[in-house]
């Protein structure tokens, strides 16, 4: 924190000399407090690393189980695959304009999903219900190409696309997992805001094994995803607790430094 404040930026190459480093003055609390703060900071690093590792593990197994070659290794070399475009197997719709003011004025139990990716994409809850059943949503703007499986009553904003499977050969959950891998590849990043339009989504081609196998794979991935999410959700809670601890000690240190300065001024 302190060393960067003493870097000489007037040179062509900014530098911090050994002489200047030796002259930096630092205030220290008791060794016990120092060790406590160091432990909290170490925990931050460990939890962040674990969070990244959990997400990598899930992505690896998801991609492995959805790979055609691996499906044939597991379920049989002669397993047939059929290829469809999204428009051939789904009804494709888009949400409507739902403002934050509308959400405030029409509170209810049904979620409104938007182009947000945090909080499962939920913007708020209203009494309306535009969709009821098993669907897939995707973000069309901003964080475009993020796919969610939905099951129940909900609403979608205008930045959210909605798919309803109409082909009896297709498992909605399985399709959602496939699209989580494939949809981001079709995001248009040249615009000021990344986009994945209804037209582009409609043209995406995907290959499917028989329905029975789709359902087996989807059940495995759904259970694994839930397990990973439960673990991952526990990590941010731990991080938040550690942050509160760190804030406490930062405030303690600040007050301690101020007290030292006041005492020094009184002596002088």
Curated annotation (Swiss-Prot):
Domain notes from UniProt: Contains two DNA recognition domains, each specifying recognition of one of the two defined components of the target sequence.
UniProt induction comment: Detected at low levels after 6 but not 96 hours growth (at protein level).
SUPFAM superfamilies with a match to the protein in the record: DNA methylase specificity domain
Protein name, as recorded: Putative type I specificity subunit S.MpnORF365P
GO BP term, example: DNA restriction-modification system
Pfam family of the protein (one): Methylase_S
Keywords: DNA-binding, Restriction system
Gene3D superfamilies: DNA methylase specificity domains (3.90.220.20)
Organism: Mycoplasma pneumoniae (strain ATCC 29342 / M129 / Subtype 1)
Function (record text): The specificity (S) subunit of a type I methyltransferase (MTase); this subunit dictates DNA sequence specificity. The single R subunit has multiple frameshifts and is probably not expressed.
Family: Belongs to the type-I restriction system S methylase family.
InterPro entries to which the protein is assigned, alphabetical: Restrct_endonuc_typeI_TRD, Restrct_endonuc_typeI_TRD_sf, Type-I_RE_S_subunit
């Amino acid at each position: 924190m302190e060393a960067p404040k003493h870097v000489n930026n007037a040179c062509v190459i900014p530098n911090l000399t050994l002489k200047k480093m030796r002259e930096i003055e630092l205030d220290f609390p008791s060794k016990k407090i120092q060790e406590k703060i160091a432990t909290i900071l170490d925990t931050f690093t460990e939890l962040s690393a674990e969070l990244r590792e959990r997400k990598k593990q899930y992505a690896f197994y998801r991609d492995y189980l959805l790979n055609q070659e691996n499906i044939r290794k597991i379920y049989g070399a002669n397993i047939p695959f059929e290829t469809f475009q999204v428009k051939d197997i789904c009804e494709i719709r888009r949400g409507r304009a739902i403002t934050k003011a509308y959400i405030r004025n029409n509170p209810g139990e049904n979620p409104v999903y938007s182009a947000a990716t945090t909080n499962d994409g939920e913007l708020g809850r209203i009494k309306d219900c535009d969709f009821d059943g098993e669907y897939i949503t995707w973000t069309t703007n901003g964080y475009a190409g993020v796919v969610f499986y939905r099951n129940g009553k909900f609403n979608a904003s205008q930045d959210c696309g909605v798919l309803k499977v109409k082909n009896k050969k297709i498992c909605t959950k399985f399709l959602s997992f496939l699209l989580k891998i494939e949809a981001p590849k079709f995001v248009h990043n040249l615009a000021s805001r990344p986009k994945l339009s209804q037209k582009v989504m409609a043209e995406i081609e995907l290959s499917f094994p028989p329905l029975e196998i789709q359902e087996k794979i989807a059940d495995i991935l759904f259970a694994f995803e839930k397990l990973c999410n439960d673990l991952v959700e526990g990590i941010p809670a731990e991080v938040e607790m550690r942050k509160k601890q760190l804030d406490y000690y930062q405030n303690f240190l600040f007050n301690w430094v101020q007290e030292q300065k006041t005492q020094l001024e009184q002596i002088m």
